[in-house]
Amino acid sequence: MTIDMHAHFVPAQMAEALRRRREAPWIEAMPEGTERIHLPIGALEFGDDYSNMTARIAFMDERGVDRQLLSFPGLFGLDSRPADEAAPLLSLFNDAVAAVSRAHPDRFTGLAALPFADMDQAVAELRRGCTELGLAGAILPNNAFLTIAEAEKLRPLFEAGNALGVHFFIHPGRRPDQVPAAGSAAPASPFADLAFARQALDVQASVAHATATLLFSDFFDDYSNVTVHMANLGGTLPMVIERMEHVAETRGVDGDRPMSRTKRLHVDCSSLGARSLELAVSIFGADRIVMGTDCPIFSTDWTLAAIRDARLDDADRQAILQGNAERLLEH
């Protein structure tokens, strides 16, 4: 069995609502008959592969993917918009992903999308999603964990999640305070050159900061009934953690050594390759890595090839493809 813990879904009725918007996220019809979705920064091609779950199942079958954990794409930035604007659309998503999961219980499990600009509403929607709709947890924005102080603002969600026994997926995404003022122009790319490379570096550095917050602080200590996984192999942290260890030893940093804390959360392998996966296994352990593809934004074939080509033994490979995800979702 193969379980994809990082896959996205945009219900058809939600896509229709996004076509009526003119602030990110919004869907624009292109002259050649295609569509693109405008994000807080940049745009992506938007197609039927986001919404057509019958076609998605056929796509999965062709590649041997048995199950997907579905979430609304955090990169779209809707969950950071003002709550009166975002909450109705996010509730629509939650109802729809629950319906898809009920219709195909062996193929899909849903995560709730939450309106983070109003924490009371976010907590209420998490409870509704998990107790009434049968969702497994929620997707949370990476930027809410860039510092311990920012993470503290999400304690009400973790307290509610701990009582419910949920799974949280931390995915690249902005906080509500990072949303531009209403009516302001969409921000330009911050990169003057080599944008494709610098954007990848920027995203992975941001994920690493969030991973560091959760690994090296005591934020998790009171939430033993919550499971968490980070996107994208924890960002650049696997490459840098040995330097952190060196700094801690040579400069007398108090507390646990960084390498002793790497078992405190799981990471998925979305969008990375075989060599990156091998490094992450050496740092986190194969028991802390789950398969993730970022379908349909990134290539499922790419991730499957990375897991196949990585220099891993069969037991570790199967743990990444199936066993670790099963334990997270069944805790």
Language-model-detected regions and their locations in the chain:
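Glycine-enriched alpha-helix->loop->beta-strand junction motifs that scaffold or abut catalytic
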Residues: 133-137, 162-167, 223-225, 261-265, ...
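Active-site gating/metal-coordination segments in enzymes
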Residues: 66-210
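Catalytic metal-binding/acid-base residues of hydrolase active sites
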Residues: 8, 144, 173-175, 215, ...
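Aromatic-lined glycan-binding groove of carbohydrate-active enzymes
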Residues: 215-260
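Mid-to-C-terminal alpha-helical segments outside catalytic/metal-binding sites
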Residues: 1-5, 11-67, 95-103, 124-128, ...
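Hydrophobic faces of well-ordered beta-strands that scaffold small-molecule active sites
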Residues: 3-5, 68-70, 109-112, 138-140, ...
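Active-site gating loops and adjacent loop-to-helix segments of metal-dependent hydrolytic enzymes
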Residues: 8-48, 176-205, 244-263
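A general structural motif
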Residues: 208-211, 248-250, 269-273
